[in-house]
Amino acid sequence: MGRVRPTTMDGRPLEALELEHFPGLCERQITAMAQRLQQQHRAGAILVLHRVGRLAPGEPIVLVAVEAGRRGAAQRCAAALLEELKHHAPFWKREWCAGQGTWLAENTPL
């Protein structure tokens, strides 16, 4: 499970993170990512729940669950999917700090 970070990209205290998406397109792209990684890691069922809207620091933002015959395969698949979501899922993110919103041009590193 991923949570909203407590600071902005430049290290200031975060008030909130706002996520927007294009309904339909976002879900299709996440499904395609999950299916590709499911095959690559020989995983079984995959569940992805990703929140949108305004979220406070520390709140859950994404849940990835992977079933596989072996624990290692499930862990590798889940880690790869979290990275894919972070860098390639079509979300627009705005950080709120001191009452000001700033749209992010890129995602945060690990």
Language-model features: locations:
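N-terminal, polar/charged subdomain of small-to-medium soluble alpha/beta proteins
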Residues: 1-61, 67-110
